[in-house]
């Protein structure tokens, strides 16, 4: 690497032409690098003009669903067979059977006949837990001082 002369100021460098020489040198180097790394010539890009008519628009066909039994299918028709309508007694019997299987009792009246004392007291438990919390809301400093309430 050759030694570069360092000018005392920008004005001296501009007057002596040093800045122009350095810029030209860097420009030549970058042009050489670009020439070396140039890719092979690309195929020309054809830009289509919208004013020229293009081919015919694509055709859209609307197809119909096949008919079943000579009747066109409607959106309300179901392919599933209709379930037989159950009587009130049958539905109540199935409900009682399912309730007994899940909850262990056949009718909702059995649940309501329990005295109030036998029912779990959830509300009382919450109140007891709240009373057991003894949180001190006025912190003390490490030396036992009043912490944040210290007068300054």
Swiss-Prot record:
Transmembrane segments: none
Pfam families cross-referenced by the UniProt entry: SUZ (PF12752), SUZ-C (PF12901)
PROSITE patterns: SUZ, SUZ_C
PANTHER family: SUZ DOMAIN-CONTAINING PROTEIN 1
Basic and acidic residues composition-biased segments: 89-100, 113-130
Domain SUZ-C as annotated: residue spans: 111-152
Gene: szrd1
Homology family: Belongs to the SZRD1 family.
Highest taxon in the source lineage: Eukaryota
Protein name, entry field: SUZ RNA-binding domain-containing
Region (Disordered): 28-152
Domain SUZ: 42-107
């Amino acid at each position: 690497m050759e030694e570069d002369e360092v000018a005392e100021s920008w004005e001296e460098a501009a007057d002596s032409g040093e800045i122009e020489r350095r810029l030209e040198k860097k420009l030549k180097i970058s042009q050489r690098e670009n020439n070396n790394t140039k890719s092979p010539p690309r195929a020309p890009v054809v830009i289509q003009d919208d004013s020229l008519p293009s081919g015919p628009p694509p055709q859209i066909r609307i197809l119909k669903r096949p008919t079943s039994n000579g009747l066109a299918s409607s959106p309300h028709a179901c392919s599933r067979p209709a379930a037989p309508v159950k009587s009130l007694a049958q539905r109540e019997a199935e409900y009682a059977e399912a309730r007994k299987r899940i909850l262990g009792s056949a009718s909702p009246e059995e649940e309501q006949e329990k005295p109030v004392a036998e029912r779990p007291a959830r509300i009382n438990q919450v109140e007891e837990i709240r009373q057991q919390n003894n949180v001190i809301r006025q912190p003390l400093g490490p030396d036992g001082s009043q912490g944040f309430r210290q007068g300054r």
